[in-house]
Amino acid sequence: PAFGTTLIIEEKLRQIGIQTEKYNTTCPFVEKVWNRSEAIAKKNYSIIIHGKPKHEETRATFSHAANNAASVVVKDMDEAKELAKYITGEKDAANFYTEFKNQFSEGFDVKKDLQRIGVVNQTTMLASDTQAIADYLKQVMIDSFPNDNPEEHFADTRDTLCYATNDNQTAVSGMLQTDADLAIVVGGYNSSNTSHLVELCEEKLPTYFINNEEKILSAKEILHHNFHTKEELLTNDFLPAKYPVKILVTSGASCPDAL
């Protein structure tokens, strides 16, 4: 799959005779994250992964990262701030293993493995959120080790952010500066990056998340997905009673342009 897979699954495929290198469909941006994780691991940095702990891509990235270095997953800025408290010593190291249960690599040593870190992400997370987490943790390291060069404790991984996802997010943010009546977002209902675009639009406009043109039933009715509740909803009179109507349309990073 585009988001890659875990080393355990790769090994199972090899055991049954499937030559995975001949069928490699992993997104190059995901592989770039893996390669950078391996590179900074060789320099004795631990890997902080910004992602949804149960998402397939995050699980794959965690598997590859943990094979080379101590690794931990943070799902958002709130978790990053809690992780920072273990760096600064504000929290008892023993509590880490409960607070971040199932989100850290085997043998993770809180006192040792948070001295040198680098941040990578699930490529479909908001790039701005990942950058904010990286900037925050970098400042924590600077404050914690004021007499050292920042690079001694924090690896620069900015160039691992996926430009396809980042470009979409930046374009949508710019688009939302335009006065409009509603937004339609097209993409897969299980797509993480598309759901982030929906979130951006929902902050400003009535937003309808659809996966194909057939969901627009008429000028009056639209079937759309509520990704918060995982329900499909039918909305009547979704178009305002005015003319002209200004509609913002965007789509997820992997959505075919023809849609």
Locate the predicted segments by residue:
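The feature marks the mature, well-folded catalytic cores of soluble enzymes
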Residues: 1-259
